[in-house]
């Protein structure tokens, strides 16, 4: 089985790695993540922070050799939470023009995330290592019920850069409104993050987003019993893949947190279990290699 897993992961792309630096505790930095990914045969990874643009992190580390040689390429992006000014077109413009590949709409700052965590106080989301001002809700809707004017400006920048628009942790109605506007503006690459975690999407929601051209990303940390984010067994992941189709699905680790499995270890574990369940190698490879690569490639 180990050889089969290694073969499937050869050329894999992880669009969802959480390294240091971060105000949330992390066990690896981008250099560590790249080294681990290279040892597992990965082609590329994207590093993410809920609090700052990781694009400049990647550029700074590139001066010391990151992205040199045959190892995996490392890319960054920006998440539109309070620390970067929320729906800030200038932050997006900077991140994309400096080489960023993903813009995550609000994650920890989305009203959905804030409400979900208030309703589930025992949810094991990482605790801040430094005391920050409380996250302010970053809503894409204005008082008139329509999208705020900053949203199309941000989407235009994403379209111009041919970058990835990611849902973040928004509610289904917000994702639909943003993705519909994105399609009209010309955004070609769209990704929904962990639809059943915080977002609380249905299969019908996901099918709607797929009809707009989006891929559905499932976070492996949700299905790994060694992870603090473990919420569902493998049956749930398989059901989602069967409902939406492997051709519209991607797998990302969503890992890097202290005390959680390493990203590549979780990939090996969950990929092995999917293969052991009888999922065709071609379908698994499509979700870990082909689909995320197609989204990421400039």
Region spans (language model):
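Extended substrate/RNA-proximal surfaces in nucleic-acid metabolism proteins
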Residues: 85-192
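Active-site beta-loop-alpha junctions enriched in small/polar residues
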Residues: 18-20, 50-52, 77-83, 106-110, ...
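An N-terminally biased module of ancient metal coordination in phosphate/nucleic-acid-related enzymes
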Residues: 1-72
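Short acidic/histidine-rich active-site segments
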Residues: 246-263
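Active-site mouth loops of central-metabolism enzymes
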Residues: 13-28, 76-86, 141-146
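Distinct, well-ordered alpha-helical segments
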Residues: 57-61, 92, 172-186, 202-210, ...
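Hydrophobic faces of well-ordered beta-strands that scaffold small-molecule active sites
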Residues: 11-17, 45-47, 75-78, 103-105, ...
